[in-house]
């Protein structure tokens, strides 16, 4: 799990670079959130299958961290769709507000996951 936490740290550090696009920063923060959700899922003894893996990992948060994470899960699902559009259909869709909000969520999520695995 140490390597997964290292990926999270790298993604968060890279996303803090303001000279890259908001789309790229959003993608990096989403990847960090996805890794954190995966760490929590693995800690609880599960792994998501390959089919709809991102969806399954993200939607596992209320089960691994508690029902307080339901709204965060919905937000991350919206971000996943936006990230998909940014990667495959368009550019310039991410806003600074979304990036900032996702950054705060990732910070909170990392704290919760670190507490879980202790």
Task: Please name every model-derived segment.
Residues 1-118:
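Terminal alpha-helical segments
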């Amino acid at each position: 799990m140490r390597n997964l936490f290292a990926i999270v740290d790298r993604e968060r550090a890279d996303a803090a670079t303001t000279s890259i696009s908001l789309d790229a920063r959003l993608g990096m923060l989403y990847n960090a959130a996805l890794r954190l959700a995966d760490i929590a899922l693995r800690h609880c003894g599960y792994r998501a299958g390959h089919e709809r893996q991102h969806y399954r990992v993200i939607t596992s948060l209320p089960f691994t961290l508690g029902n307080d994470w339901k709204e965060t899960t919905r937000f991350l699902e919206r971000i996943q769709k936006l990230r998909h559009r940014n990667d495959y259909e368009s550019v310039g869709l991410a806003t600074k507000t979304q990036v900032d909000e996702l950054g705060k969520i990732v910070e909170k999520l990392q704290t919760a996951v670190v507490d879980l695995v202790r």
